Amino acid sequence: MKKIFLLFTLVFSFGVLADDHLPENFSMYQTNFLFNCPEPEMCFAAFDKYMNSPMVSKEKFEVDFFALQQNGWDESTHGVSWYFKDADQYAKAGELFATTKAGREFRKSMNNLEVETISDTLTVHSYGKVLAGETADNVVSLRWSLEVTDPAKFVPLWVNFSKSIEKYDWTSNGYGLQTHYLGNNGTGITHEIWASFNTVQDALAFLSGLNNSKEFAEYSPKSREYSKFKRSYMEVSLKQYNPD
């Protein structure tokens, strides 16, 4: 019952927030898969073949295949995120994966390569903002995974902090907050904070500026009252399909 109540609280509080604080081109739902791939080139080739199969490619799903860097938290080496505009797109993607020949061949390839799925989650954007650049150009992102214990207090604190660092030349091209609805992460993660950049160098400059800023020094101890840090890592996009 406690988990059900917490889920209701998250859905209600963040659902209201999402309606008022998302750019029009942001997806309604995201599915995120982190996995360990012993042979990255072959994993990518198998996924690319699936995405370019006739039945899948005609749907023009927005998808990102990426590599993980500085991920010392588990065995994930790569990931795939799907961005769905609505529930119908989400349902269609699941149907094609489960019922088509292309989906069957892709699953067989992954099994033959001994790919291990580490996490599989369904998330929604609770807050998002684009400051500069296009999605296709912002190929690097930093991510922080949290267990938020008091969303009503954490979210406005984080939003105000994020806005306060927009003025710096090292700030990100975009940032957002995602809420976990379903899936396995094994560590109590409820939310993800992300910040996007054109290059790895820009992301590193952001980290330096962030950690030396007075705003972060003030925000950090307050945020720990309402959230628990779980992990952080960098994502570098290897290929984007139909970026919006």
Predicted feature locations:
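Positively charged n-region of N-terminal signal peptides that target proteins for export
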Residues: 1-4
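Internal alpha-helical transmembrane segments of multi-pass membrane proteins, especially GPCRs
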Residues: 6-9
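Short S/T/G/P-rich N-terminal loop/turn motif that feeds into the first structured element of a domain
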Residues: 18-218, 222-244
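N-terminal signal peptide c-region/cleavage motif recognized by signal peptidases
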Residues: 13-14
